Swiss-Prot record:
Cofactor remark from the record: Binds 1 zinc ion per subunit.
Pfam families: QueC
Catalytic reactions on record: 7-carboxy-7-deazaguanine + NH4(+) + ATP = 7-cyano-7-deazaguanine + ADP + phosphate + H2O + H(+)
Keywords attached to this entry: ATP-binding, Ligase, Metal-binding, Nucleotide-binding, Queuosine biosynthesis, Zinc
Record-stated family: Belongs to the QueC family.
Binding positions (ATP): L10, S11, G12, G13, L14, D15, S16, A17, T18, A19, A20
Name by which UniProt lists this protein: 7-cyano-7-deazaguanine synthase
CDD domains referenced in this protein's UniProt entry, alphabetically: QueC-like
């Protein structure tokens, strides 16, 4: 039986790295796909390259999609401030990037169909990540329908399937799985700020560091002080 091919959206963060490693564990030939979208934290692209090399991915592509050209998010607009006050329940945060996952998944599906890949691997997490509308199960279900209807492969009955194994997991479980799989957590990048070191105070750093402490790995926290 031929090895299944999967396209993994690889941001350079912990979640996407863990999802890619899970696909490899399932026996997939994994192709990584990363995006320079004008994000202030471009440091994550270096992390994505390191993760791809560590996992020995079959291919790794970086695509330029300048969503920062029109801003609309604290991650792409230097005039907006990245929040450090914690996640506010029921409020979509200013770190939401308009249309980001829709654009990324669409490009991922294009690559998947071109490569004959059976699935598209996503590291989205609806439980911990601030309630972004494009990280939720209903969004993924709707996009799967779109993917099936909008592609030649889908119309022929063998279109790529969206696979988001982390979508209902706690961040602590993701850390535990990353450790089990040998994901190079120290090489991943989750911080929203544009500095050379994680800030330790943005929402993403807070969630990550809390999970690392719960998993007994404070040495991997932003400030490595536990």
């Amino acid at each position: 039986m031929a090895q299944r091919t999967a396209i993994a959206l690889l941001s350079g963060g912990l979640d996407s790295a863990t999802a890619a490693a899970l696909a490899q564990e399932a026996g997939d030939r994994v192709i990584g796909l990363s995006f320079d979208y004008g994000q202030r934290h471009r440091r994550e692209l270096k992390a994505a390259a390191k993760v791809a090399a560590h996992l020995n991915l079959a291919e790794h592509h970086q695509v330029d999609v300048n969503l920062g050209a029109w801003g609309g998010s604290a991650l792409t607009d230097p005039n907006q401030t990245v929040p450090t006050s914690g996640v506010e329940e029921g409020v979509i945060p200013v770190t939401y990037v308009p249309g980001r996952n829709t654009v990324f998944i669409a490009i991922g599906l294009s690559l998947a169909e071109a490569r004959g890949a059976e699935r598209l691997v996503l590291g989205v997490n609806a439980v911990d990540y601030s309630g972004y509308p494009d990280c939720r199960p209903d969004y993924l279900d709707a996009f799967q329908t779109l993917a099936t209807l909008s592609s030649k492969a889908g119309r022929e009955g063998h279109g790529p399937q969206l696979w988001a194994p982390l979508v209902q997991w706690s961040k602590t479980k993701i850390v535990d799985e990353a450790l089990r799989l040998g994901v190079p957590i120290g090489e991943t990048w989750s911080c929203y700020s544009g500095g050379s070191r994680p800030c330790g105070v943005c929402d993403s750093c807070r969630i990550r560091d809390s999970a690392l402490r719960e998993a007994g790995r404070p040495d991997l926290c932003s400030n490595a002080e536990g």
